[in-house]
Amino acid sequence: DSIVDEEVSQRLEQVQMAEREIVLEEFREGLGLKGNTLAFLRSQYKDSYLVYQISSKYLFEPILDVPMADYSDGEFVTDEKTKLKSFEVDGKSVTSHVVDVSKYQGDIDWKAVKNYGIDGAMIRAGIRGYGSGEIVADTNFDTNMKNALAEGLKTGAYFFSEAITVEEAKEEAEFLLNAVKPYKVKLPLVLDLEMIDGDDGRNEKLSKEEMTKVALAFMKEIADAGYQAMLYGNIRTISEMVDLTQFEDYGLWFAYYSNEIYICLLYTSDAADEARS
């Protein structure tokens, strides 16, 4: 029996080594075809994990049980002149192209933005400083809002949050509501929630549960005022900062810069550069 057991063990070890070599070979071939490690890992775990990279570390977050879009690269058409992507159904675009702007874009020629093929604009109303914690208005908000509306663009607005309490989140929502009150805003009002690198971010000290509670307080204030509330963030926002399953009643705006569709809505920062003066 011991001889049989030894032979079985040897055979199992040989099979395991052979399978390991097959996996490694597939990995090497995949890296060669995809061109980079991150793209390959995403292709391998697309149905089970969100994969992202922080410095030299690859992180894997289980995909949550939330409603998902079923877009694929093949269903997007890219305009050769503007490079804007459109999602088509039966050969017709069902996409709205929207830019987001703040004072950092300077003086914007909104007529040029409109002519470029842009349908709307998300305009920054203000921020809470991640160091001071003070709310600061975006100095170009009113100018951008008035001029975008004058060109017939739909508009929405966003606020960069560093709230660490429910009370601060409500204060930010009230600030945003007051900012848009004079205007006919048809697009969502957005909580911009991002992780600040380093130790400067106020909200980095919060747990995911605490941050989720704070963000939801903002959302509720906006929704109760009759607007569509939306969360803005990148992969780290939805995987590390908040529990995404708690936001199914609200809009979600992903920041993801790549030519390859992954979980992408915001896909370029250059579309309307030529409209800046």
Question: Model segments located where?
Answer:
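Boundary/entry segment of secreted carbohydrate-active catalytic domains
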Residues: 3-116, 124
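Generic detector of short, locally flexible boundary/turn motifs and exposed helical patches
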Residues: 60-67, 84-89, 121, 154-157, ...
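Extracellular/periplasmic catalytic domains that process cell-envelope and extracellular macromolecules
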Residues: 90-94, 114-117, 149-151, 182-185, ...
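Substrate-binding cleft of extracellular glycoside hydrolase catalytic domains
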Residues: 95-115, 122-214
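Aromatic/hydrophobic pocket-lining residues that form π-stacking "cages" and hydrophobic walls in ligand
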Residues: 144, 218, 268
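Generic helix-packing signal
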Residues: 152, 180, 219, 275-276
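Catalytic domains of cell-wall/extracellular-matrix polysaccharide-remodeling enzymes
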Residues: 185-265
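Single conserved hydrophobic/aromatic residue that forms the stacking wall/gate
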Residues: 267-276
